């Protein structure tokens, strides 16, 4: 009420864990779903009544919500649920002029993945399997979010925009790529 209306909501929260599904306990699953699905659901629910036509909700998901992965079942499940929520919001609130889209980053240079990037093999595989031959930067994701909130993105609704330099197009998630000697 203090600000009168909300023009844009960007749900950008995540935690990571490389655990496979069979090693993920219920507490970990609940934590992942709480941070990456339940919180964005609640935020969208609570702000949608304050949004006007032309407003937008942007959910930051992951390439692992789009192409799957060999590890991180709780992460993929939560981000996949957020992708589904994105399309639901777009369909339900699009007639009111409120858009909802998702941005699905690939491996991006953030504090969340910093420890993984210390592993030279991980860094090399992800860099070389990306046609752009580099990892994502925060600016790559931020500029996509800004575009989706702008007039230029006004006719985009219910979409997941993958921002990974082509990484998901390379079939990275094969046993060969994960076990290759670089």
Q: Which residues are covered by each model-predicted region?
A:
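Substrate-binding pocket helix/loop in short-chain dehydrogenase/reductase
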Residues: 20-21, 28-33, 126
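Active-site loop immediately N-terminal to the catalytic Tyr-X3-Lys motif
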Residues: 21-22, 54, 67-73, 95-96, ...
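Active-site helix of classical SDR
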Residues: 44, 78, 86
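Alpha-helical segment proximal to the catalytic Tyr-Lys
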Residues: 49, 91-95, 154
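Residue(s) in the substrate-gating loop at a strand-loop-helix junction
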Residues: 62
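Short C-terminal tail/terminal secondary-structure segment
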Residues: 67, 146, 157-182
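C-terminal helical subdomain
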Residues: 102, 121-156, 163-165
């Amino acid at each position: 009420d203090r600000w009168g209306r909300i023009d844009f909501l960007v749900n950008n929260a995540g935690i990571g864990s490389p655990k496979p599904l069979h090693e993920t306990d219920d507490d970990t699953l609940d934590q992942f779903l709480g941070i990456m699905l339940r919180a964005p659901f609640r935020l969208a629910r609570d702000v949608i009544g304050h949004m006007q036509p032309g407003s937008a909700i942007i959910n930051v998901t992951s390439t692992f919500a789009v192409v799957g992965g060999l590890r991180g079942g709780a992460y993929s499940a939560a981000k996949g649920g957020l992708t589904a929520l994105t399309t639901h919001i777009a369909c339900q609130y699009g007639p009111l002029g409120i858009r909802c889209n998702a941005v699905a980053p690939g491996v991006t240079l953030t504090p969340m993945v910093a420890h993984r990037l210390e592993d030279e093999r991980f860094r090399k595989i992800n860099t070389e399997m990306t046609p752009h031959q580099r990892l994502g930067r925060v600016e790559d994701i931020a500029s996509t979010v800004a575009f989706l909130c702008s007039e230029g993105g006004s006719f985009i609704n219910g979409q997941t925009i993958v921002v990974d330099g082509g990484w998901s197009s390379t079939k990275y998630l094969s046993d060969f790529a994960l076990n290759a000697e670089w």
